[in-house]
């Protein structure tokens, strides 16, 4: 009976975070269009869900983030949308391009929740204070997103990225590092602040005090 009650709370918690992600997506503040990439706030619910519900929930929420990314980049494309939309990628690079886009848009986002969830478990096992652990997990989750996405673009789509930016292939690494050092750092700082503020409050909610689901 206890396990059933805990599982029900877990499912309700996951549904709550999914609903928050959908609100961010529908209102347009989940993925904010910039000239060549879309800045994101959708990683925040993924990280928070991973903290209070565990890595499995984090992976599910990361998958929802990925689906939102694919949808947005397909129906409202910007310069780099071919890297996040298997539909657009398939038009220019066939099935191989579609697979690459699925990994970048979906797979990398699943990893946000996995990394954040397991890092939180490790930090709590070694008894790190919440006020330290929460911002660390926030930064790690945000940087997992930025580094995996931009790193995958560099490894898998370097020629296409060079063509988009109208630069030589040798210049792509510098451009990728520029994105990581600007929008990536900004997203990490925002994640540290928001995950700490909201996460601290959520950890006082009785429903989130139970042992999180690990897989």
Question: Where on the chain are the PLM-derived regions?
Answer:
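Loop-helix junctions at membrane interfaces
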Residues: 1-215
